[in-house]
């Protein structure tokens, strides 16, 4: 159903895949409602993903500009599937520090797009030092959100206050830590059950740079999506950390969806769990 008052949502990810993997469903839900969604990968992730682009994994490295071109092509395809706009920045991944100039450029995007909601990484998300860009980008975006409303900011664009910031929870490497995939608790769930196939299509657009096979896409969707959906009582969900106080006039009764289930490790069935740990 179209939204009578369209939202403007900006997603800032360290790498293009971060935005698609974490929020493709949310993006699809909102573009279908008539909302305006802007994806902003802060880097191409060319250094991090370069080995994946080698003819055989680990067989060598390709020129960065070649990798960037490949990733940009893939990201454009994914955003087209999702109905989102793309603003690709060109900061260096793996060594992104969140300098004044980098924060200023992010600030200008916020002031220009004027989003109601900003989505980015949790500032503590280093994935056990494997992904330092996550935390650094999250911190830089949080600073830019504040800076966007500072009248002394070095920008020709008018100031703007972002009212809502959602964070992707800080996480373990889920391939290694399947039982506890996030180390910061999610408290905001988006039901993406109706757009799960759109998310799958968007993820498959990244198959060149991240080796996203059909099997990997299915694992991400039936693993984490179902895992968090079970926690929320829906078939599939994407999760966030809501950073602002949530105020209500009074407490309300809440119905739990029919898919409420035991929180199993991603990809596990109840039978597997019982066989491993017993009843």
In which residue ranges do the predicted regions lie?
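Metal-dependent de-N-acetylase/amidase catalytic core
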Residues: 1-10, 85, 97-279
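Active-site rim/loop-helix segments in enzyme catalytic domains that contact anionic ligands
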Residues: 1-113, 273-277
């Amino acid at each position: 159903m179209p939204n009578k008052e369209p939202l403007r949502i900006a997603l800032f990810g360290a790498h293009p895949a971060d935005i698609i993997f974490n929020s493709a469903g949310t993006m699809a839900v909102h573009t279908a409602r008539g909302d305006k969604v802007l994806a902003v990968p802060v880097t191409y992730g060319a250094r991090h993903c370069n080995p994946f682009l080698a003819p055989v994994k680990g067989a060598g490295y390709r020129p960065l500009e070649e990798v960037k071109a490949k990733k940009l092509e893939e990201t454009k395809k994914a955003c087209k599937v999702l109905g989102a706009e793309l603003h690709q920045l060109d900061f260096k991944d793996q060594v992104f520090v969140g300098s004044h100039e980098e924060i200023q450029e992010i600030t200008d995007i916020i002031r220009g797009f004027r989003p109601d909601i900003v989505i980015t990484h949790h500032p503590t998300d280093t994935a056990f030092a494997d992904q330092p860009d996550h935390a650094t980008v999250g911190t830089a975006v949080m600073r830019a959100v504040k800076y966007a409303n500072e009248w002394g900011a070095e920008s020709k664009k008018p100031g703007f206050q972002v009212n809502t910031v959602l964070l992707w929870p800080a996480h373990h490497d889920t391939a290694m830590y399947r039982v506890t995939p996030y180390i910061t608790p999610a408290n905001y769930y988006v039901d993406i059950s109706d757009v799960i196939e759109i998310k799958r299509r968007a993820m498959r657009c990244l198959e060149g740079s991240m080796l996203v096979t059909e099997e990997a896409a299915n694992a991400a969707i039936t693993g984490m999506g179902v895992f968090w959906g079970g926690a929320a009582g829906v078939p599939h969900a994407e999760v966030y950390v809501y950073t602002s106080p949530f105020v209500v006039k009074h407490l309300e009764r809440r119905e739990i969806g029919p898919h409420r289930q035991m929180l199993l490790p991603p990809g596990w069935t109840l039978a597997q769990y019982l066989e491993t740990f017993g009843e």
